[in-house]
Structures are given as C-alpha cells and as structure tokens.
Amino acid sequence: MSEDLADRYAVTLDLTGVTDKTGLMERAAHVLDLPEWFGRNWDALLDSLCDTTVWPTPAVERGLLVVVRGWHTFAEKNPREWRIASDILSEAVDRTFLLDVMLALGGNAHL
C-alpha cells in the first residue's frame, strides 16, 4: 500500500527537552495552534487531532502530517505517559482520514 503525503501540511512536534505531560501538551498546543480552550489533557488532545475545524487552515483541505521529533527522552523518562501519547496519536490517525503522524527516528530510537 502506498500513500502520497507530499501535499500534506506538515508540522513538527519537537519534544526535545520535554520531560512531562504538561510540556507535551504545551508543545502540541503551540505547534498545532490550538484554541485557548484546549483542555491540555489526553482526551482534549485526541479530540483536537480528530477535529479538522481546529487544525491550521492549510491542513483542512490538504491534510495534516505531524512529525514527532525528539521523543526518545520523554519516552524513556515517562514510559507510561509515552504509551498513552502514542496510543492517542494512533487512535487519532485511525479516526481521521486526513491525519498522519510520523515518529522521526534518530539518536536512541528504540521503539
């Protein structure tokens, strides 16, 4: 199966230096330009990723590609939180046709 992601609107969720859920939510809110009412919890993140009305404008028609970088340290220090985050990202992709999420490998990429 092949999918062309070339035209997707891409944003980078850089988790370098993020050590907790609060930091992850703040980064996500910033890079996705989420509204002030974004609840900064797992359910709100899932809802926002699945709701194209809160996506950056170019992504609504073209689709959204979220590239997650620098996630290794967060995953190592917070394995439970990382498991939840990765489950949320996976579920959002499963629910939303125009959404793709990629984990950038590099450094200590141990999945």
Predicted regions and their residues:
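Positively charged, polar, low-complexity stretches
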Residues: 1-111
